[in-house]
């Protein structure tokens, strides 16, 4: 190391401590990268790769690769690296290079990871960005998650043989960007597949002991927080301790905005497994992974990013307490009934900045002048909101009114200190308001009026000395000087100090002139430094008020979410459901909340639902494909879920007993990554449901057994339904869609089972789906008619009819083979049927004469 230059030695020492990160090494106005980091950054960021001569750098085998980026535009580059899964260690100059003696001191100020980003370019406004931790040990599991961009921190515990399954569901619900795992959790196959393949989150494997974990938690949240953790389960304490230790290690600073811990217990919220979240399309669609088309898309009419995040969390954590559900629904109902206040609140909430994330940047010291001014703009909107809330005399809305601190003092402090439109960088100056600080005003006067000040001094000196030809000038050698011609040099005062003799005169300086010169030449640096000092004082003061500001931000988020639910209820014609512990699901004229919004021009057919603890506990639903069986079942599940987040529901009326869990088995697909076939995936999911469900669960089962032979599939479907419906075994409320019509006889053999079908009207060879759920089993599946709607050739349709008749008449005797002659005929008739099918599909009235002629020619060619 002795042969290295001091700067490269410093670089390598810092890099050695951050081997797993790309090191952004501050050199002047740039962040430079060297060696392998430079190669990686050049490739990932499309940067030009240059080299640094070897000189004394014998630690490198050849010229040192290097590349760099301007420090003031680093956020975008960091965001791109983080999105690609890298970590970035930011190494700053920790002293002023102008005053440094020798090598400038540098140190890591922060390590940016996927779970710890703070800048807006890397964050989705309406979605939390969690860094999580999971701890697994035999039959105990702990989970913790923190969004450092808002300060929200959660933790929970699971015990028993299914602890690992519950942990898996919790990780899926939070969908963290990064997760810290102990060795046992890291080796868990299901957890590895979820985090690596499905969530694509960054994994860190770390261990921590009990005393260190307790110290981290007590230091962050206080000793009292330790009492929340169960005495018989150490896993959540170790998970949270591991997470906090990692956050302190990467953030290198105070995390005092993370001051509130939400420790929740199993049973507070409805647990939804990965399959249910996916199949019900709560936050994104199955196919496109888009928000549009999801339940969140329908519900999210929030005006703030804080409200959007809270509403999303409500949707992902339905409540189980009737009291808590009613408490939230009461707020929604009051807002529904008070149109004027609701609309005024929506207007007042509009444009409020993301107070939570602004405060995180302020606490970390990364906030600029524009961030602080954005906070001020948000704070100034709080008083009108508080005034509007005073119309609610009681309940949670009144509590929000009391909680909402208008923070007038902080808004006033910011307004007095900062300009309304500060520059992008606080290093540019000109962001402290005129009149706030006398010295700033004086230095600005000097900076902007330097020429005027010199002209004023020149006039004063002329008057004082009586020298008419006296003038003040400037050159790079002497700076400012007073020049007097030879004819007046005898009148020069003793206070003038001669600096230069000219042919026609003399040049002098005075102490007063040198003082003014110093002010003018250093004013820019001095005012910039003073403004930055005043700004950091303000930022520190605001950081000290983080608890007050975050409390008001939380109140705004909750109010915004409630207003959103109320707005949706009014615009979509929802009703308030009665939620109780009766175990009954009774829905009149229920509608699918998403389907009716995706197809606003089509008339949505509402349907009734009744499922009691005894009568109608299980419903067998038969009918053709495309008729709406899956839509109806999802509709029931979504109405239940909406009710349990405190929302109104798309129905004329509803009475809903609280459901502890919703399970879904819908659709079929291979899981190639796990080496499982479609049928194996289906059976695994059914097995998980039967083991985890209780009598208070709602089961949505679609086409169980279709992935194997007919008799095997029918046997499995019947056995599963018997198990679900039998109160001596499971007795859960079950919606069971099937094409096995033989199962409909279970209505007579198993109490609590009822048959329903989707009404269909046949018109000749055509069918019309009425979308209405009616009692009784379907008498046929209309599969051939659906095939015709899908556009299968008429020759295939005709052959299918023949086979069906033979199967129905001979009770399973194999259909007679098609004769060779028939084959030959069918080949020609197939062309004819394709032509007929094409003609049926064409909208002839919309064709131009030329298009019609081309179509005719094409069809004739096909027949020939």
Give the location of each predicted region:
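Conserved phosphate-binding elements of NTP-dependent enzyme cores
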Residues: 1-2, 9-13, 20, 539, ...
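Charged catalytic and DNA/RNA-contacting regions of genome-maintenance
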Residues: 1-334, 350, 354-363, 367-459, ...
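Extended active-site and interfacial segments that coordinate phosphate-rich ligands
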Residues: 38-55, 146-174, 490-521, 601-611, ...
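Intracellular alpha-helical coupling/juxtamembrane segments of multi-pass membrane proteins
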Residues: 325-328, 348, 352, 450, ...
């Amino acid at each position: 190391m002795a042969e290295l230059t001091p700067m490269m030695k410093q670089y390598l020492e810092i890099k050695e401590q951050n081997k797993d990160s790309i090191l952004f090494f501050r050199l002047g106005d740039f962040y430079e990268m060297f060696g392998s980091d430079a190669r990686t950054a050049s490739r990932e960021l499309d940067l030009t790769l240059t080299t640094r001569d070897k000189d004394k750098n014998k630690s490198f085998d050849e010229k040192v690769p290097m590349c760099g980026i301007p420090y003031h535009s680093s956020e975008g580059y960091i965001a791109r690296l983080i999105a690609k899964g890298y970590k970035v260690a930011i190494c700053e100059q920790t002293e002023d290079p102008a005053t440094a003696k020798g090598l400038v001191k540098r140190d890591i100020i922060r390590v940016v990871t996927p779970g710890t980003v703070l800048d807006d370019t890397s964050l989705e406004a309406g979605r939390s960005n969690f860094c999580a931790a999971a701890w697994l040990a035999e039959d105990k599991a702990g989970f913790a998650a923190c969004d450092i961009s808002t300060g929200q921190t959660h933790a929970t515990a699971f015990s028993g043989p299914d602890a690992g399954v519950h942990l898996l569901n919790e990780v899926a619900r939070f969908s963290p960007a990064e997760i810290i795992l102990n060795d046992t959790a890291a080796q868990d196959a299901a957890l590895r597949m979820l985090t690596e393949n499905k969530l694509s989150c960054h994994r860190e494997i770390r261990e921590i002991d009990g005393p260190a974990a307790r110290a981290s938690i007590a230091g962050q949240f206080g000793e009292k927080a330790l009492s929340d953790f169960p005495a018989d389960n150490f896993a959540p304490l170790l998970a949270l301790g591991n997470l906090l230790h990692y956050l302190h290690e990467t953030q290198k600073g105070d995390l005092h905005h993370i001051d509130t811990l939400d420790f929740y217990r199993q049973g507070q919220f409805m647990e939804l497994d990965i399959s249910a979240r996916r199949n019900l399309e709560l936050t994104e669609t199955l196919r496109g992974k888009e928000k549009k088309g999801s339940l969140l898309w329908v519900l999210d009419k929030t005006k703030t990013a804080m409200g959007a995040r809270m509403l999303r969390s409500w949707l992902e954590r339905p409540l189980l307490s009737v009291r808590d559900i009613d408490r939230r629904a009461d707020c929604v109902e009051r807002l529904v009934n008070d149109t004027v206040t609701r609309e005024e609140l929506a207007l007042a909430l509009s444009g409020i900045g993301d107070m939570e994330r602004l405060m995180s940047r302020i606490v970390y010291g990364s906030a600029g002048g524009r961030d602080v001014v954005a906070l001020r703009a948000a704070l100034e909107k709080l008083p009108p909101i508080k005034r509007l809330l005073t119309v609610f005399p009681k309940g949670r809305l009144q509590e929000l009114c009391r909680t909402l601190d208008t923070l007038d003092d902080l808004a006033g402090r910011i307004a007095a200190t900062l300009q309304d439109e500060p520059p992008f960088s606080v290093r540019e100056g000109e962001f402290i308001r005129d009149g706030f600080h006398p010295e700033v005003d004086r230095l600005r006067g000097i900076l902007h009026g330097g020429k005027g000040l010199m002209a004023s001094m020149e006039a004063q000196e002329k008057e004082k000395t009586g020298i008419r030809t006296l003038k003040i000038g400037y050159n790079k050698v002497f700076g400012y000087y007073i020049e007097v011609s030879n004819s007046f040099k005898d009148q020069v005062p003793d206070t003038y100090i001669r600096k230069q003799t000219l042919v026609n005169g003399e040049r002098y300086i005075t102490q007063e002139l040198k003082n003014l010169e110093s002010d003018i030449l250093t004013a820019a640096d001095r005012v910039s430094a003073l403004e930055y000092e005043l700004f950091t004082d303000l930022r520190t003061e605001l950081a000290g008020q983080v608890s007050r500001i975050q409390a008001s931000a939380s109140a705004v988020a909750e109010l915004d979410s409630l207003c959103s639910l109320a707005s949706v209820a009014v615009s979509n014609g929802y009703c308030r459901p009665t939620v109780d512990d009766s175990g009954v699901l009774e829905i009149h004229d229920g509608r699918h909340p998403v389907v009716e919004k995706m197809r606003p021009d089509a008339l949505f057919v509402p349907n009734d639902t009744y499922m009691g603890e005894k009568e109608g506990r299980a419903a067998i639903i038969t009918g053709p494909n495309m008729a709406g069986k899956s839509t109806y079942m999802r509709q029931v599940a979504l109405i239940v879920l909406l009710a349990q987040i405190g929302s109104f529901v798309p129905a004329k009326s509803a009475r809903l007993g609280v459901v502890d869990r919703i399970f879904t088995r819908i659709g079929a697909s291979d899981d190639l990554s796990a080496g499982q076939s479609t049928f194996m995936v289906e059976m695994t999911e059914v097995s998980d449901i039967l083991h985890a469900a209780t009598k208070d669960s709602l089961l949505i089962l679609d086409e169980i057994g279709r992935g194997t032979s007919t008799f095997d599939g029918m046997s499995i479907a019947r056995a599963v339904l018997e198990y679900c419906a039998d109160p001596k075994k499971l007795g859960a409320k079950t919606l069971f869609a099937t094409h096995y019509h033989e199962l409909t006889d279970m209505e007579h053999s198993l109490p609590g089972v009822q048959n329903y079908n989707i009404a269909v009207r046949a018109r000749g060879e055509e069918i019309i789906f009425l979308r209405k759920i009616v009692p009784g089993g379907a008498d046929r599946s209309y599969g051939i008619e659906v095939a015709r709607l899908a556009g299968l050739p008429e020759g295939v349709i005709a052959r299918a009819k023949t086979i069906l008749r033979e199967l129905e008449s001979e009770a399973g005797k194999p259909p007679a083979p098609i004769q060779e002659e028939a084959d030959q005929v069918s080949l020609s008739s197939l062309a004819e049927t394709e032509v007929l099918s094409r003609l049926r599909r064409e909208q002839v009235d919309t064709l131009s004469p030329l298009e019609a002629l081309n179509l005719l020619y094409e069809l004739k060619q096909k027949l020939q």
